[in-house]
């Protein structure tokens, strides 16, 4: 059974979390308008100006991290020394590293998915339905959840956009993570996990509590699927044989979730904490 190792209190609405190669935890504070990191047990934060940009999704890279501000219409980069830089973007939300060293991000309100090459040039794909989270698979296929479109989109390496409607109406897909055989995603409003194959075939897996409101999902190196249950304040685990177990979390509203290099997990509780969990 998973075990809570520590709880770090952080005000300001922790939302997204990511862990870099050294084990440093980076996070966004959506309510405060800040980003931060946890270094040797010490919380360090960097205020953003203006503070109402809603920093949400964050991705560690090198000595810093990238993050999105969908209300601020920009993508930020924070360095280990606290230095900030920004790129202009239209309502960015989901963010991931591209195989060519560039970035992929979603335009939550503008109905687009954008690839930013290492040289700064951008290619935009029109993808309606409130594109939310995004992830690129090893073969270059990009998966995107369409929260209002009730679908999952795939962008092939040659740039074709293919969309698969979900079997359950009004499922509200959000969180997404790639796996060896496609991608896993959560259905916030239907209380289900979903899996999409590389060919677009979708299967759905109901949770024990259909009102749990799953939000974020990650896939561990061993293939275990972990997910947060926003309404139920729990961390869920699905093993390869389909068994689901759940761990009650302190506080409320778990959002972001990340796997550390040592295999432990971090959960962002929007009620004001970062929770460290042993699998």
UniProtKB/Swiss-Prot annotation:
Its EC number is 4.2.99.-. It comes from the Bacteria. The keyword Nucleotide-binding does not apply. Its cofactor is Mg(2+). One of its GO terms (molecular function) is magnesium ion binding. Substrate binds at residue 215. Inactivates the type B streptogramin antibiotics by linearizing the lactone ring at the ester linkage, generating a free phenylglycine carboxylate and converting the threonyl moiety into 2-amino-butenoic acid. HAMAP family: VirginiamycinB_lyase. Belongs to the Vgb family. This is Virginiamycin B lyase.
């Amino acid at each position: 059974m998973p075990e809570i190792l520590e709880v770090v209190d952080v005000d300001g609405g922790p939302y997204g979390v990511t862990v870099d190669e050294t084990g440093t935890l980076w996070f966004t504070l959506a309510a405060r308008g800040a980003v931060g990191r946890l270094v040797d047990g010490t919380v360090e934060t960097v205020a953003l100006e203006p503070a109402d940009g809603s920093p949400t999704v964050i991705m560690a890279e090198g000595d810093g991290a990238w993050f999105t501000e969908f209300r601020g219409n920009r993508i930020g980069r924070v360095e280990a020394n606290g230095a900030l830089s920004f790129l202009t973007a239209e309502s960015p939300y989901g963010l991931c590293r591209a195989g060519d060293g560039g970035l992929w991000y979603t335009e939550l309100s503008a109905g687009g998915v954008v690839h930013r090459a290492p040289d700064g040039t951008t290619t935009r794909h029109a993808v309606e339905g409130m594109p939310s989270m995004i992830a690129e698979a090893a073969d270059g296929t990009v998966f995107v959840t369409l929260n209002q479109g009730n679908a999952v989109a795939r962008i092939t390496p040659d740039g074709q956009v293919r969309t698969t409607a979900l079997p359950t109406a009004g499922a509200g897909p959000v969180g997404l993570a790639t796996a060896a055989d496609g991608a896993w995603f959560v259905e916030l409003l239907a209380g289900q996990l979903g899996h999409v194959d590389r060919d677009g075939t979708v299967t759905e897996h109901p949770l024990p509590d259909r009102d749990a409101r799953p939000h974020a999902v990650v896939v561990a190196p061993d293939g275990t699927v972990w997910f947060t249950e926003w309404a139920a304040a729990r961390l869920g685990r699905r093993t390869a044989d389909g068994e689901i177990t759940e761990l009650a979390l302190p506080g409320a509203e778990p959002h972001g979730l990340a796997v550390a290099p040592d295999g432990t997990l971090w959960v962002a509780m929007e009620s004001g904490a970062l929770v460290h969990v042993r699998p």
